A protein has these predicted regions:
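Loop-to-helix entry region at the N-terminal start of transmembrane alpha-helices
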Residues: 58-66, 101-131, 290-303, 340-375
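Membrane-cytosol interface at the C-terminal ends of specific transmembrane alpha-helices
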Residues: 117-178, 182-185, 357-416
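Alpha-helical transmembrane segments of multi-pass membrane proteins
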Residues: 58-70, 94-98, 102, 137, ...
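A structural signal for multi-pass alpha-helical bundles of membrane permease subunits
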Residues: 19-32, 98, 106-114, 177-180, ...
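Transmembrane alpha-helices and adjacent helix-loop boundaries
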Residues: 31, 40-47, 88-89, 99-106, ...
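Cytoplasmic-entry segments and transmembrane alpha-helices of multi-pass inner-membrane transporters
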Residues: 80-108, 138-139, 297, 316-351, ...
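N-terminal, non-cleaved signal-anchor transmembrane helix
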Residues: 1-84, 88-91, 220-333
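Hydrophobic alpha-helical transmembrane segments of polytopic membrane proteins
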Residues: 197-232
């Protein structure tokens, strides 16, 4: 081992890999006047108008209702998956399903069902059912603490009347968290044509209507911040019923589209066009070395860049929500809530419009979103920390010599 301390060793390797990533990273800014465009974007927040409010409200309602139905169905399916989660086939199937992002599922179902509500719902339900199934199973297992002599012989009765009620608060808490995630996921489905908030966000950005962009973002923040008031044990049943009534254009299964998808759309070119062996090898070589390998390499570089940026952001900003460093952490909480409530795709899209295509928009988006989450977690952890009696009163010394060494291991765990 390079250093005796494990955290120092990990940090050294992390920084070294980050430096190498910077060498290969494309951080260019290709827009003609990026700072002028940035100032226009942030300056437009004071010029919000409601001329397009009817379109935005419709998209907002679509976003909310799709997310409600998706999480309702996903939680039911997830619970059944959790019951049979011990099966290796189920575990592998769920792992594969949840590893595919909802945007990719949306692109698949758009080819089969077209641009409608059903495609959007399936794009959320399939990966979220797999995620909920895995986490529900883990929650049920963690709460299965009763000794064998108290379980009785009827396993079904034990499961329904003892195991589930004991774990129920944790199941509900995680489902509510996933509902917040579903709102963000549904919003970004607009980038592929579904009429949710992301659809109008993309349209207004392309047209330079930044005041409308801010209206969308502010409405989305309000929805996220008030979830506990409009989606709780008293309102979720009426909300589910209202969502089914509100949503329209469910579409229908087109056999022709389904056949075309499996017999043409996803069939590799060598099989579709009957390539010769040499042409097939050339096709595969180009695909492997010019697209797959390049994509994998760029993904690794962006990941390492975003980790470096995230680490710096979290270490700089966790004090703004820590009572050890600020007497009024409220405004720091608001700042971090806004950042972590904004989907990474929306942040990346904003930076893409401001700075042009490169690795910079993705790295900055991941930094702000993930950095805000880690800052919030670390800041809350420091609030529970008991300081030594002889601790210094100077903030910088308290940060470097008292707080940071004690939370650094947990910080690395959150980061990786």
């Amino acid at each position: 081992m390079l250093f005796a301390n494990k955290n120092i060793n990990v940090s050294f390797i992390f920084i070294l890999v980050g430096i190498v990533s910077f060498i290969f990273a494309d951080l260019s800014i290709s827009t003609l006047h990026p700072f002028l465009e940035t100032s226009r974007f942030f300056g437009s927040i004071v010029d919000i108008n409601f001329k397009n409010a009817d379109y935005i409200v419709e998209a907002l309602l679509n976003t909310i209702t799709i997310a409600i139905i998706a999480i309702f169905i996903s939680s039911i399916l997830g619970f059944f998956f959790a019951i049979v989660f011990k099966s290796m086939i189920v575990r592998i199937s769920l792992a594969f399903t949840r590893s595919i992002h909802e945007l990719f599922w949306a692109l698949i179902f758009l080819q089969i069902f077209g641009l409608n509500t059903l495609s959007a719902l399936l794009a959320i339900i399939i990966p979220y059912s797999a995620i909920l199934g895995k986490v529900y199973a883990e929650i049920l297992e963690e709460n299965d603490t009763f000794p064998d002599e108290l379980r009785g012989k009827d396993k079904i009765s034990y499961f329904i009347y003892t195991k589930v009620p004991d774990a129920f608060p944790h199941l509900v808490a995680y489902t509510l968290y996933r509902f917040e995630c579903a709102l963000r996921s549904t919003a970004i489905l607009g980038f592929v044509g579904v009429i949710t908030l992301g659809y109008h966000l993309s349209s207004f950005f392309n047209q330079g209507y930044y005041s409308d962009v801010w209206l969308i973002l502010i409405l989305f923040y309000i929805v996220i911040a008030t979830i506990r008031y409009w989606f709780n044990k008293y309102t979720f049943i009426p909300a589910i019923i209202a969502s089914f009534v509100y949503l329209k254009d469910w579409g229908e299964l087109s056999i022709d589209n389904l056949i075309r998808f499996f017999t043409s759309d996803i069939v590799p070119a060598p099989f579709k066009y009957d390539y010769s062996l040499d042409k097939t090898l050339n096709w595969f070589s180009n695909l492997l070395f010019e697209e797959i390998m390049v994509g994998v390499f760029n993904t690794i570089v962006v990941t390492q860049l975003s980790l470096i940026f995230t680490a710096i952001f979290a270490l700089l900003f966790f004090p703004i929500v820590s009572k050890k460093f600020t007497k009024i952490p409220f405004f720091g909480h608001i700042f971090l809530v806004v950042l972590r409530s904004t989907p990474e795709y929306i942040l990346a899209y904003i930076f893409l419009q401001l700075f042009g295509p490169s690795m910079l928009p993705a790295a900055l988006a991941l930094m702000l979103h993930n950095g805000a989450i880690i800052s919030f977690l670390i800041g809350n952890q420091t609030n529970e920390m008991e300081l030594r009696v002889d601790s210094t009163k100077k903030s910088i010394e308290l940060y470097l010599y008292e707080v940071l060494p004690r939370i650094y291991s947990q910080f690395l765990a959150f980061l990786f």
